[in-house]
Amino acid sequence: MALKREIQGVVLQKAGDKTATILVERRVMHPRYHKFVKRFKKYLVHDEKNETRAGDTVVAVECRPLSARKNFRLKAVLAKGVE
């Protein structure tokens, strides 16, 4: 069985029932200037129990496609956001 990819990010918004949008930051080296720059990407995550709120830090794990853009399932909520 292949290892499932895990991503960690911050919940931006609840995109609907059982769906959250998370922002994932990664650091890559610039090819010319050899400086680390931040790159951001948004993912849709399946939240079966509707337990996330905007600002939460979460971990999601890759799964089978649940919709056209949703390929991750919520694994854990690491920290609650300040509201």
Curated annotation (Swiss-Prot):
CDD domains: Ribosomal_uS17. Belongs to the universal ribosomal protein uS17 family. GO terms for cellular component: cytosolic small ribosomal subunit. Keywords: Ribonucleoprotein, Ribosomal protein, RNA-binding, rRNA-binding. GO terms for molecular function: rRNA binding; structural constituent of ribosome. Part of the 30S ribosomal subunit. It comes from Campylobacter concisus (strain 13826). The gene is rpsQ. The keyword Signal does not apply. PROSITE patterns: RIBOSOMAL_S17. NCBIfam families: PRK05610.1, uS17_bact. This is Small ribosomal subunit protein uS17. The lineage of its organism: Bacteria, Pseudomonadati, Campylobacterota, Epsilonproteobacteria, Campylobacterales. The keyword DNA damage does not apply. One of the primary rRNA binding proteins, it binds specifically to the 5'-end of 16S ribosomal RNA. GO terms for biological process: translation. Pfam families: Ribosomal_S17.
